[in-house]
């Protein structure tokens, strides 16, 4: 038995990069690859992807099979305006919904989109929580 959390995270990053069709592709990366705090190119949006949780459930006889449920957060940031972050959010949701079935995974689901604009000044932020399910990684 192994963990599926980083496999799911890498799949999400590569999927967003390869299937982006709405204008210029944002800077998409895992959160630990972002080297600076507080600095962002105000002309290009940023999407940070990070793992939140992995739960492992037993199913099958005698614990022979395991279902891994991995929660991933996709955090979109923009300095443009509300319309721009709304378009970025719609593109993220479009990509995830178009890829419900992923190779190597049971499925990929949108759990909850959350606006966090009220916490910041001069920056728009939206978080989409997604869930991967995989058996016996």
Regions found by a protein language model. Give the residues of each.
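Acidic-leaning, charged glycine-interspersed low-complexity segments
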Residues: 18, 22-25, 35, 42-46, ...
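Short secondary-structure boundary micro-motifs
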Residues: 32, 66-68, 115
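Short capping loops/turns at secondary-structure boundaries
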Residues: 5, 85, 119-123
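Short, low-complexity, polar/charged sequence segments that are solvent-exposed and flexible
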Residues: 50-52, 66-71, 91-95, 130
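Oligomerization/assembly interface segments of phage tail-like spikes and tubes
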Residues: 64-80, 124-136
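Small/polar-rich, solvent-exposed N-terminal microdomains that initiate assembly or binding
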Residues: 1-62, 83, 90
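Extracellular/virion structural assembly segments
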Residues: 63-67, 77-97
